[in-house]
């Protein structure tokens, strides 16, 4: 970490903008002065080593120097520049390389002042199994299934699809039109009669020989052609086969094909793909309002509209102001004619295109609601090997698709703003109800603990985190509770609080003595919720007194009369009287939301642990000489299988009916 002089602060001073340039470490200014006039990517770091901003430049020296050659005042860019203490750069060969590297780094480093589209789950695919095997008859009859993950060459994958629902709709279509199987191979290989799907005309029952391998292969081929967009050809082939069977007076087979043709015709009509020339297209519509943005991605694959998916970027206001104030200057300086500054919509859309298609196949055509930089499309083509065209202001069917995407973007953004407004109101109500002194409601951090077990078995504690007006799933933690009397919730609460805050409390004490806070140190929450009444709060108070932490942070959620929802009361560790907020209180709604999430998280973890313990518990009875009675005595003596596993052979031999030799056998079996 760079050393700051005593006269400097990592934060910009409050108040009016100074007349002089903000001070920066000499090493930083020296690094800036020594930059080459070459294309590249730069990263700014603050005092704690966190990445502030990632940018690209045609001329690194000119671009980076512009940040430090003038006073930016109290703007967002000024606030960011005041925090910069270190710089890193990477020289590249071209602007296209700079674009790709910049957005790779943005996704990897999560800088505070860049437009950031956070990674979501990978896209789902429709999987069709392949690679016939003589040892597995099922592979001669491929199955269709939902799939998410790494692909294997021996199978075929169609997609990606925007959602799991879209894949399941496609699978249902494969069943209705082509009667393809969906059962797992072990089920397929061991069936002796058709399943219900055969009865309702959604499977041809290849498992029991109701269709030949050749006919099933024909259905598979038609399904593949349909998924690739050759719907018309599939329809013509089915009609030709139907007429051929009719001419041979094979009316039952002709009727089956007639039903397939009717089902396929209905699908094509519903999805409006009768005369669509586009095979694979992504439609991107952006809506910006209230400092937030939504990019709605609609996907057309094989000429079929598969649905859409909304994305909500972070840091829109900060990033666009910095781009407009500084990031775009270079484009003006390095061009003979000054182009107009891109709109916020264009900046958001370009950020999405650059980040989204790093890990997702890009189709040859993008239909966009705002213009996209040609250099960005060239960079995508270099990365993917596919020539990419962006169509702005489309016509005919493309225009219909774009209008649908724009409508959905507006609806999704309105929903988000409404939800955020409601959640912010709840946060404010909680802060006011508990007299929490906060300058920034966004910074309110609540951690909630819950204990879960079944009759003392598989005890786990959960900790969930609420911050920035929403639950922070990535910060959830589970704690396995050991070495306590089974069922002792108070001891479990004591253990989890010590483990959660013990090291942090020690670090804070050392920082008070040295006057320096180590980099990367976490912070105490503004509120610690425990699911329980006075007993749990008393235990939490003992732990905080032992650690020297502020007792006013602790609040217990005590169930009301009859344990009815809405009658909960808040119990305080610092001696304040209990508070009843009222069943319609926004503050209580937030407390209940956090408490219920902690309970859900604890329950799911406890059930998984209990299932594992019970499966492992079968090992005891597998040991020669251990029957139900001796197993029961062992579990009763040591509190569970884990306790038996942790015990030594000498301890195990103290159990009635367990000899020294058997104890050693048990010890070996469990280790």
From Swiss-Prot:
Provide the GIY-YIG domain boundaries: 37-115
Its annotated compartments are: Cytoplasm
Checking PROSITE patterns in the record gives: GIY_YIG, UVR, UVRC
Q: Which GO terms of type biological process are on file?
A: nucleotide-excision repair; SOS response
Q: Does the keyword DNA damage apply?
A: yes
Assembly state and interactors? Interacts with UvrB in an incision complex.
**HAMAP family for this protein:** UvrC
Reported function = The UvrABC repair system catalyzes the recognition and processing of DNA lesions. UvrC both incises the 5' and 3' sides of the lesion. The N-terminal half is responsible for the 3' incision and the C-terminal half is responsible for the 5' incision.
Q: What is this protein called?
A: UvrABC system protein C
What species was this sequence derived from? Albidiferax ferrireducens (strain ATCC BAA-621 / DSM 15236 / T118) (Rhodoferax ferrireducens)
């Amino acid at each position: 970490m760079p050393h700051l002089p005593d006269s400097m602060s990592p934060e910009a001073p409050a108040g009016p903008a100074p007349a002089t340039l903000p001070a920066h470490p000499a090493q930083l200014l020296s690094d800036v002065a020594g930059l080459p006039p070459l294309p590249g990517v730069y990263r700014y770091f603050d005092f704690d080593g966190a990445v502030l901003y990632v940018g690209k430049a045609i001329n690194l020296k000119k671009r980076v120097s512009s940040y430090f050659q003038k006073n930016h005042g109290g703007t967002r860019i000024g606030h960011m520049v005041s925090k910069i203490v270190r710089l890193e750069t990477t020289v590249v060969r071209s602007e296209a390389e700079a674009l790709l590297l910049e957005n790779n780094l943005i996704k990897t480093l999560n800088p505070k002042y860049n437009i950031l589209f956070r990674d979501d789950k990978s896209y789902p695919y429709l999987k069709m199994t392949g690679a016939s095997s003589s040892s597995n008859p099922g592979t001669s009859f491929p199955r269709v299934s939902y799939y998410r993950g790494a692909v294997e060459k021996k199978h075929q994958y169609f997609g990606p699809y925007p959602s799991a629902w879209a894949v399941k709709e496609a699978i249902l279509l494969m069943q209705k039109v082509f009667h393809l199987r969906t059962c797992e191979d072990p089920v397929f290989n061991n069936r002796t009669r058709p399943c219900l799907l055969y009865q309702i005309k959604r499977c041809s029952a290849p498992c029991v020989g109701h269709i030949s391998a050749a006919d099933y292969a024909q259905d598979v081929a038609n399904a593949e052609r349909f998924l690739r967009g050759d719907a018309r050809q599939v329809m013509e082939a089915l009609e030709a086969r139907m007429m051929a069977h009719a001419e041979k007076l094979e009316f039952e087979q002709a009727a089956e094909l007639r039903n397939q043709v009717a089902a396929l015709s209905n699908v094509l009509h519903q999805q409006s793909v009768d005369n669509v020339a586009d095979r694979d297209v992504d439609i991107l519509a952006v809506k910006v309002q209230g400092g937030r943005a939504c990019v709605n991605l609609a996907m057309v694959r094989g000429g079929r509209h598969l649905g859409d998916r909304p994305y909500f970027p972070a840091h829109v206001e900060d990033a666009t102001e910095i781009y407009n104030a500084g990031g775009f200057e270079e484009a003006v300086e390095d061009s003979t004619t000054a182009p107009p500054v891109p709109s916020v919509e264009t900046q958001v859309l370009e950020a999405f295109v650059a980040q989204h298609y790093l890990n997702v196949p890009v189709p040859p055509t993008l239909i966009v609601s705002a213009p996209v930089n040609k250099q960005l499309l060239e960079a995508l083509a270099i990365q993917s090997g596919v020539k990419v065209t962006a169509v702005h202001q489309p016509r005919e069917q493309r225009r219909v698709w774009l209008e649908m995407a724009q409508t959905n973007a507006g609806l999704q953004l309105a929903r988000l703003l409404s939800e955020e407004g409601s959640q912010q109101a709840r946060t404010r109500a909680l802060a006011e109800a508990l007299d929490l002194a906060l300058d920034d409601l966004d910074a309110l951090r609540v951690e909630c603990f819950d204990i879960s077990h079944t009759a003392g078995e598989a005890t786990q504690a959960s900790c969930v985190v609420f911050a920035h007006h929403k639950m922070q799933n990535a910060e959830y933690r589970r704690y396995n509770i050991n070495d306590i009397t089974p069922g002792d919730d108070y001891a479990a609460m004591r253990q989890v609080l010590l483990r959660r805050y013990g090291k942090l409390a020690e670090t804070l004490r050392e920082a008070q003595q040295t006057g320096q806070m180590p980099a990367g140190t976490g912070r105490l929450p503004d509120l610690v919720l425990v699911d329980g009444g006075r007993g749990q709060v008393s235990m939490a108070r003992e732990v905080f007194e032992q650690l020297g932490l502020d007792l006013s942070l602790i609040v217990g959620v005590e169930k009301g009369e009859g344990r009815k929802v809405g009658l909960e009361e808040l119990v305080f560790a610092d001696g304040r009287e209990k508070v009843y907020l009222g069943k319609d209180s926004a503050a209580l709604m937030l407390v209940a939301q956090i408490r219920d999430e902690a309970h859900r998280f604890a329950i799911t973890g406890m059930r998984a642990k209990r299932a594992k313990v019970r499966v492992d518990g079968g090992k005891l009875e597998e040991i020669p000489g251990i029957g139900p009675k001796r197993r029961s005595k062992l579990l009763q003596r040591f509190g569970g299988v884990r306790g038996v596993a942790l015990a030594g052979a000498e301890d195990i031999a103290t159990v009635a009916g367990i000899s020294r030799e058997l104890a050693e056998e048990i010890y070996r079996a469990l280790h």
